[in-house]
Amino acid sequence: MRRRILARIFLLDLAALAVGFVAASVYTFGTIFPWNAGFEFVRPGQSVFPLLGILVGGLALGSFVSSRSWGAGMPRPTYGRAVSNVTAMVVVVALAEFFVRDQFYYSRTYVAATAVVTFAAALLHRAIARARPWNEPVALITHEKKLVEDLQGAPHITVVDVLDPESHAPPGPLPRGTTLALDLRAVLSDPMAQYISSSNLAGYRIRPLVDVYEEHTGRLAIVHLAEGWELQTPMRATQTFQSMKRVVDVALTVLAAPLALVLGMLIWIAVRIDSRGPAIFRQARTGRGGRTFTLYKFRTMVDGADADGAQFAQVADPRLTRVGRVLRKVRMDELPQLWNVLRGDLSLVGPRPEQPSFVEQFALSIPFYEHRHLIRPGLTGWAQVNYGYADDEADTIEKLTYDLYYVKHMSPWLDINIFGRSIWTVLSGFGAQ
């Protein structure tokens, strides 16, 4: 079933490429037949089919890489995969042109138009698929009510049954294609162990409950973590990625610097006019490895708002100034933190850094809280785009489930997802704190 879904997604992407190839021909040359001779993007006597073959090869490469990042779960028509597939397609064309320049020539306008239309068509067929029911049927074998509730509220999963691990009564028949999600911490009765074994022989997929939970909720089940869990987390494998991520952080920050300086000057003036006190607010935060650093922000509260010590910010915090309320709404108060990114205190994407006093408090009361410091904190993060406000310890625990998920699964694709959703967060004001 997994292979059929992957094949269907790839074939639909191929159809999107065909639409893009022909639409680009209409846009560039005014005809729907791009294989006709005499076009500007092929030399006399040169066929257009090598270009089409290279585009298909690039799309296949992107699809293969995407399929490897899905894990063991059912593939889903995600928008992020459309980005990676089309990007791979364009990169392969560029590499082909670079290495065989004398034998291969094409119109960059034509390829760009093909990529744009292909991307739009790929997004469209994914939107149609996501609008239809495509839930994965799952039977949960666990006592954990919280995990069951979270999965019952998660999109694209149907909890067809919740089975008692210690039950001695034989469970009823399950629909074909159902996945059995097994709580590995549960003690199984002999009849239940036999049922799971026979289900496996009958062709039902048996998967750890925590894996299903992570895939469908984007969170780590803290209740299932144990000391040494990071040994199963491929942190060593991400060292290369973290080094590359640092290069990207610096490059993007330098590119954004001119615009950031202009906006920063305007915001600085507005803050100084609006209320008394410095425009830039400095505060100690805890970063990677528990190291304390100075974080910079535009001041959004009245001067001296933290005189009584660290406090959670509230949705309608009375300490906010008029300009500060607007800055928080669009998150422009965090613009000076680009300097923290250049210094290496922050990454563009990662868990948000907390004040040291909060870190000390949560490290004592929340299991595994300090594991969020395994990586650099970020300007935006997985918890920010999924949860929003955290104004007490209970909310902090919920956000930690997202932070630890990011620590475990950090990747370029997840960062792109977070960036895209952060733009929506800025535009909508959701989670601005």
List each language-model region with its residue ranges.
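C-terminal terminal-structure detector
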Residues: 368-433
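Juxtamembrane loop-helix boundary motifs flanking transmembrane segments in multi-pass membrane proteins
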Residues: 3, 67-75, 232-243, 315, ...
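A hydrophobic, helix-centered structural microdomain
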Residues: 241-305, 340, 417-433
